Amino acid sequence: MSDIALTVSVLALVAVVGLWIGNIKVRGVGFGIGGVLFGGIIVGHFVDQAGMTLSSDMLHFIQEFGLILFVYTIGIQVGPGFFASLRVSGLRLNLFAILIVIIGGLVTAILHKIFAIPLPVVLGIFSGAVTNTPALGAGQQILRDLGTPMEAVDQMGMSYAMAYPFGICGILLTMWLMRMIFRVNVEAEAKQHEDTLSNGHSLIQTMNIRVENPNLNNMAIQDVPILNSDKIICSRLKRDETLMVPSPGTIIQSGDLLHLVGQPVDLHNAQLVIGQEVDTSLSTRGTDLRVERVVVTNEKVLGKRIRDLHFKERYDVVISRLNRAGVELVASSDASLQFGDILNLVGRPSSIDAVANVVGNAQQKLQQVQMLPVFIGIGLGVLLGSIPLFVPGFPVALKLGLAGGPLIMALILGRIGSIGKLYWFMPPSANLALRELGIVLFLAVVGLKSGGDFIDTLTQGDGLSWIGYGIFITAIPLITVGLLARIFAKMNYLTLCGMLAGSMTDPPALAFANNLHATSGAAALSYATVYPLVMFLRIITPQLLAVLFWGLG
């Protein structure tokens, strides 16, 4: 059997063994995709014992390409909502998550100086303790750029594997510890979260207002500044018993009921100007109007602003909301449409059908993958990651690398959405498949390279001390920030658990947090809010640590 055939066969065996290990769960918690790392260690041990020779060039390519696939698909997935997560609504959560990353870096630096831990080893411990695989890849690349011998670079994978198990267990123990210390009632926390959302902290809400301001009588909607802004959408108007879709030229009269959509603060401002909020229903049931959601799939409308499509004037249809990558937005007239956007339409059935034809609404297109944008994005990401940034006093130029470059490019392209007929939307199933394939390939190679010396290091070398260092790097930031967030910020427990899981980019921890309450989405929401920024910081941190330690050492 040739080297290439043997290498592919061994990698397939690693994936099978590793995924089987990852599916083993204790009380609903397992290693998940991280099991591939331990499958690689097990198989790598026996490959080394048998004296098999694998293709080192092929292993290197597979490791790097797997990492690129993984970080690129993550960026495409979270890109549309990344910049929205940095708004004020998620600012507090992101600040606490950033604090966890900073404290983890400081603990790593202190351990490195006190115990003189070799640079590759301490970076591997850091990456494993925070359960972040792209950090491992970024650290290995910067070490190679610094001229570190390959044998030492491979040590990083071994120390990563030593610290990884407690990295997963540590976050779960922290959640349990917070629950015990503060005697948390999970049901009460879930109810508090729901009450917070209903009291105006969700992004988009609706309000029915009766026109009582005499100054607005017989004015056109377009002449009322609060109604002609991009912050408020008036999607329905009820006069006596007649429900209609208002256009910019619609004349409003005293006593009219307006159904407005917008953010809570903007709705409150509109209510102060227009009149009194009422409980009267403006439902389309029993009328000739209906509400329907359609999806943007027509390439001809991609990148066009809503105002330029003239849906109100041509079809008497209002877009009341726009959902982009799971984030509800006000459908402002300046918003540009992207592939996969979901539009909430209000109008007559025939008019809605006409608008649906204009925007596409072809569900089958959502399952198709454009491969050209994928490789354009990967190529641009690799180029971005290769651009050197020279910092005075640093021994080498900083680079985003093969982990950071594709991630940043994917975030940007995911936010842009489309350029001409190229769109970077990727069906969730396809995104997940490429992401899982990438991380399996990367971890399989890391495990194989670490497996030969893993047992000896654990039983006869420094393996146990590495595990101890990892426990400090995992536990100190999580417990410190967990206490601060709960005591001083009065953070909801379920939200706190999601934020802690997101700060470690740890899906098994998110699964555990979600299982704390069957119906609450608090943990998933906070996890998604901090995940994109934390992933970026986790990739950059080991590079900064490596350059600083190298310069100081």
Swiss-Prot record:
Topology term for the membrane: Multi-pass membrane protein
- Keyword terms of this UniProt record: Cell membrane, Membrane, Repeat, Transmembrane, Transmembrane helix, Transport
Q: What GO cellular component term, any one, is given?
A: plasma membrane
Subcellular compartments: Cell membrane
Q: Which domain of life is it from?
A: Bacteria
Q: Which Gene3D superfamilies match?
A: Regulator of K+ conductance, C-terminal domain
MF terms from GO for this chain are: monoatomic cation transmembrane transporter activity
What Pfam families does the record point to?
Asp-Al_Ex, TrkA_C
The RCK C-terminal domain covers 192-276, 279-361
Q: Which InterPro entries match?
A: AAE_transporter, RCK_C, RCK_C_sf, Transpt_YidE_put, YidE_YbjL
Membrane-spanning residues = 4-24, 28-48, 65-85, 95-115, 158-178, 371-391, 393-413, 437-457, 464-484, 493-513, 533-553
Q: In terms of one coarse class, where is the protein primarily found?
A: membrane
Example GO biological process? potassium ion transport
Question: What PROSITE patterns does the annotation carry?
Answer: RCK_C (PS51202)
Report the family membership. Belongs to the AAE transporter (TC 2.A.81) family. YidE subfamily.
Q: What is this protein called?
A: Putative transport protein CKO_00031
